[in-house]
Curated annotation (Swiss-Prot):
Keyword Chloroplast among record annotations: no
Broad enzyme group: ligase
Species annotation: Christiangramia forsetii (strain DSM 17595 / CGMCC 1.15422 / KT0803) (Gramella forsetii)
Coiled coil: 462-533
Keywords carried by this UniProt record: Coiled coil, Ligase
EC number: 6.-.-.-
Pfam families in UniProt: CC_BshC (PF24850), Rossmann-like_BshC (PF10079)
Keyword Coiled coil included in the entry's annotation: yes
HAMAP family tied to this protein: BshC
Family: Belongs to the BshC family.
Gene assigned in the entry: bshC
Protein name: Putative cysteine ligase BshC
One example GO MF annotation: ligase activity
UniProt-listed NCBIfam families: thiol_BshC
Superkingdom: Bacteria
Length: 538
């Protein structure tokens, strides 16, 4: 399969913070622990082995065995769960929401990056074991972010009748209503072996499991179980009890807010945007009905928009009795993950890494080893036919990533039989007016303003003429312009990265297991570039 790649800066889709992190800019070195290079994992292993509470392993295995009890578990996943008992076993984690039928393509890229990094670590450090973990965001409550997927330019949306949707953790929501989505999906995906696998996976996942959490675990296991992926839903009381001391310090001392405030000021002073601003208390109170913020006022604690309240002593007792009711938010969830897992590295997208970079001082204050942070692989999938079309249109890979009007203007200028670039004329005009400025200074300086006004007017006139000629030439080259726009629209649905829009089923129905196999082969988590992968020839 032909593979092409471009650098992340050339895509124009990554923020300055992430690009500077990838280039190991010195000013950012205080915001992370170790840069994710294979040689640096040795020290990370040593540190995590020393700092991790290995007694948690027993509870972790028990919880995983319970969560996998109704699934067909592959030999590789079973071996990985069992291996977690050993002090020489470590994890690599990616986290993701419970998007309907995995959501956009980058769900696959996240998990494949994670699996492939564990393989590389095993080669480099064979005396240890490395387990790829998918941390399901079962406690998120933003239902509108996850209740749809895009296939063939159409949006397949789940209208959940559960009135708790959007109010409490999505993992516990009923899968009711997904039979309607299944009918529409089945009609769209058609027939054939690959289509039957997709329909079967959707049907067994959502129509034979009662909760979104169980359904998502089934689907992720169907796709990635044979590679040894281990899926964690961390809301279990047996795991939450190990986070009690950290939740206590958050409630009483507002530790995450206190520790990250200075970091945010430093990040801001370097000219970067802040990804997440912490609240005073970065915890939710979670029940079957609600997930609402915990607020402190005058030494007492309240649950936002409810009648629930406690004194300090009462909330600490509630924490001791029901740790599962205290749900971390985006600022505290990373700490929880690193407390309960023997983890070395977190793999995420640019937005995720941006908020992780805010947290190092918080981890240090809580005496938890800060993991290495690795940007997940990114890719664009194209057909051989699309690649041929691009080459015929003489569009480079880099040009594909331009804004559409920039791409079209550039190509029209290039293929036009007349020169529509007036840069030379503008430079000549500026030179001519320089003589007039000199003349005005020598005669009467009050004329300088008039000269300037005339210069601006004439430059604007040239601009206007250039745009009119370009527009006329676009009309003349209408077919060419339409082919360019059509190709880019196909590869960048909704003028966005394909990986953030298109569901994997659109490609799986065509290429089946080849899709997963080729992604496993081609996506190198330690290779810092954006891949363009070509499937099939016509």
């Amino acid at each position: 399969m032909p593979t092409n790649c471009i650098s992340y800066p050339e895509t124009n889709y990554f923020t300055p913070l992430i690009l500077d992190y990838l280039s190991e800019k010195k000013e950012l070195s205080n915001f992370y622990h170790r840069f994710p290079e294979i040689e640096n994992f040795g020290a990370q292993i040593t540190e995590k082995k020393k700092s991790y509470d290995h007694t948690i392993r027993k509870d972790l295995i028990q919880v995983l065995n319970d969560q996998y009890s109704k699934l067909t578990v592959s030999e590789n996943t079973r071996a990985n769960i069992d291996a977690l008992e050993s002090k020489n076993t470590f994890t690599v984690v990616t986290g993701h929401q419970l998007n309907l039928f995995t959501g956009p393509l980058y769900f696959l890229y996240k998990i494949i990056s994670t699996i492939n990094l564990t393989k590389k670590l095993k080669e480099k450090y064979p005396e240890n074991n490395f387990v790829p973990i998918y941390w399901m965001a079962t406690e998120d409550h933003d239902f509108e972010e996850i209740n749809f997927f895009n296939l063939n330019g159409k949006k397949f949306k789940w209208n959940n009748a559960d009135d708790r949707a959007g109010k409490t953790a999505v993992g516990g929501l009923s899968t009711e209503g997904l039979d309607e989505v299944f009918k529409l999906f089945s009609a769209e995906i058609g027939g054939g072996e690959n289509a039957e696998f997709l329909k079967s996976t959707f049907e067994k996942g959502y129509l034979e499991h009662d909760t979104l959490s169980d359904a998502t675990r089934f689907i992720a296991n169907e796709i990635f179980g044979k590679y040894g992926l281990v899926i964690v839903a961390a809301g279990d009381k047996r795991l939450k009890k190990h986070f009690i001391p950290n939740v206590g310090s958050e409630l009483v001392e507002h530790s995450s807010h206190k520790q990250t405030t200075e970091t945010l000021q430093k990040i801001n002073s370097l000219g970067y945007n802040i990804q997440v601003n912490p609240r005073d208390i970065n915890l939710f109170y979670l029940t079957d009905e609600i997930r609402e913020r915990i607020i402190e006022r005058d030494g007492n604690y309240f649950v936002h928009e409810t009648e629930i309240s406690w004194t300090k002593e009462e909330i600490l007792q509630e924490l001791k009795d029901h740790p599962e009711r205290f749900s971390p938010n985006v600022m505290t969830r990373p700490l929880y993950q690193e407390v309960i897992l023997p983890n070395l590295c977190y793999i995420g997208g640019g937005g995720e890494l941006a908020y992780w970079l805010e947290l190092k001082s918080y981890f240090e204050a809580e005496n938890v080893t800060f993991p290495m942070l690795l940007l997940r692989n990114s890719a664009m999938l194209q057909t051989g036919k699309q690649n041929d079309k691009r080459e015929k249109l003489k569009i480079s890979i880099q040009e594909l990533f331009l804004k559409q009007h920039e791409l079209i203007n550039r190509k029209v200028r290039k293929i036009s039989d007349i020169d529509i670039d007036f840069s030379g004329q503008k430079e000549h005009l500026v030179e001519q007016f320089q003589h007039m400025y000199d003349l005005a200074e020598k005669t009467d300086e009050s004329f300088i303003g008039a000269v300037k006004a005339q210069e601006v007017k004439q430059l604007k006139g040239l601009d206007h003429l250039e745009k009119r000629l370009l527009k006329a030439q676009k009309r003349k080259l209408k077919d060419e312009v339409e082919r360019i726009a059509e190709l880019q629209n196909d590869l960048f649905p909704n003028r966005s990265l394909q990986e953030r829009q298109t569901n994997f089923s659109e490609f799986y129905v065509e290429y089946g297991e080849e899709l997963i196999n080729k992604l496993m082969e081609e996506l190198d988590p330690l290779e810092s570039n954006f891949k363009i992968l070509t499937f099939g020839r016509e």
